[in-house]
Regions:
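N-terminal catalytic cores of NTP/NDP-binding nucleotidyl/phosphoryl-transfer enzymes
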Residues: 19-82
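N-terminal Rossmann-like or analogous alpha/beta NTP/dinucleotide-binding catalytic cores
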Residues: 69-154
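Positively charged, low-complexity intrinsically disordered leader regions
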Residues: 1-27
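Active-site cores that bind ATP or allylic diphosphates and position pyrophosphate for catalysis
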Residues: 117-213
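A short acidic, often aromatic-flanked loop/helix-cap motif at beta-alpha or helix-coil junctions
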Residues: 17-21, 105-108, 165-170
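Short glycine/serine/threonine/alanine-rich loop segments
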Residues: 54-56, 95, 156, 195
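A structural preference for short, hydrophobic beta-strand core positions in alpha/beta folds
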Residues: 60, 100, 160-161
Length: 213
């Protein structure tokens, strides 16, 4: 388990089998949150607002690598934001803690019941917010109702946040943002993201042929 702190938002890496995290009880938003688009922001803001109303700390629980990258290593979709940018966008919403849960074979094999009774308590989560289509656990066998049913006996609850749609009633998703970018429509992508899409990278020294022209 590793942790760092930036602008009062603590960032933690955690894997199945690690010790339980120290700290206060959390109201958390959970998801992959690639690109942190407007729909993601709605889920995260719901968790933050509830945490503040109850005097608790807020968190975002996300997965690293993206599950699709784990299962489709040869043809995984491109990331809308690298980890640094993703953390920056999430922190800007005002969350107290970002927890990156490692998506590995241990997590893949964790069934829905164990996720609720073991993983969420280890992270300190007491209340969870997720998109209405959220599924988790081995074979995606769990959903919001699963958390509420199993979590009732251990003090964990979950709330489904209605998926955000655009003016044409189409749900905003990371896949739609990627499609807009691939179609050469950055303005449409930015409307769904709620911010401009940026690319970061390292500048490499070239052959310096330009100075000979």
């Amino acid at each position: 388990m590793d942790s760092s702190q930036n602008n009062k938002c603590e960032t933690i890496d955690w894997s199945v089998g690690d010790a339980s995290l120290d700290g206060p009880a959390l109201v958390a938003a959970i998801g992959n949150f690639d690109g942190v688009h407007r729909g993601h922001a709605q889920v995260i803001s719901a968790a933050i607002d509830t945490a503040r109303a109850q005097g608790l700390a807020s968190a975002v629980v996300t997965f690293d690598p993206h599950p699709r990258e784990f299962f489709r290593q040869d043809d995984a979709p491109f990331h809308l934001a690298d980890r640094q940018e993703k953390d920056r966008l999430i922190a800007a919403l005002g969350v107290d803690r970002i927890i990156h849960v490692r998506f590995d074979d241990n997590l893949r094999c964790t069934d829905a019941e164990s996720f609720v009774t073991s993983v969420l308590p280890a992270l300190g989560v007491k209340a969870l917010f997720a998109g209405a289509d959220f599924a988790f656990g081995r074979g995606r066998g769990g959903d919001i109702d699963t958390i509420n049913t199993i979590g009732a006996g251990i003090g964990i609850s979950a709330t489904a946040v209605t998926l955000l749609a655009d003016p044409n009633s189409a749900v905003i998703t990371s896949s739609r943002v990627r499609a807009a970018l691939q179609d050469g429509e950055p303005e449409r992508a930015a409307e769904m993201l709620g911010h401009d899409w940026t690319v970061t990278g390292t500048v490499q020294m070239g052959d310096q042929r330009g100075r000979t022209i």
